[in-house]
Amino acid sequence: VSCNQNVSDTSAFDEGLAKFEKNKTLADKTFDAFIAKDLDAMMDMYADDAIWSPANTLDSLTKDALREGMTGWMTEFEVFSFNDRQYYPGVDDNFIPDGSVRTYGTWVGTHNSGATTVSKYYSVTQYNDDGKIVTALEWFDVGGVFDQVESQLQN
């Protein structure tokens, strides 16, 4: 063993992981604001030029469309909980954490009709240096949520 061993530079990894830890807290606050139906607090977490790709489309939508979509969910459902939250760092092409947050969890909702729904959820959020969400990508079975409501109403 030589005294002149190369020491790996982990500064980029450490910096990315620190950004992830900060942004993970912001992601959690965003979900909590949705659950509390505090639309203004939730929207404050997003940059004005944020791009939203909801689960039922491949479109890149605006912050105004996000507000409209979240208003719809908050209007249709009495209550939500987001269980089993798991947060993981997103990575760049070299597998270095880039500050983005990958979120897994299970949404449980009570529809205005009284029907309950359960849906697995995955998202990726990217943040700017001000700690605002600039990109929000979501995946879950939107149709399945409303199929659950419909099947309970038929019984």
Each language-model region and where it sits:
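Low-complexity, intrinsically disordered terminal/linker segments enriched in charged
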Residues: 134-155
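A short hydrophobic beta-strand element
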Residues: 97-107
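A short, structured loop/turn motif at beta-sheet edges
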Residues: 92-99, 112, 126-132
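Hydrophobic pocket/interface hotspot
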Residues: 30, 41-43, 50, 66, ...
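A solvent-exposed, acidic/Ser-Thr-rich amphipathic alpha-helical stretch
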Residues: 39-93, 97
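Short, cysteine-centered beta-strand-loop-beta hairpins and adjacent loop/turn segments enriched
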Residues: 59, 108-118
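Short, low-complexity N-terminal intrinsically disordered segments enriched in polar/charged residues
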Residues: 3-36, 40, 44, 155
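Short, surface-exposed coil-to-beta transition loops
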Residues: 102, 116-123
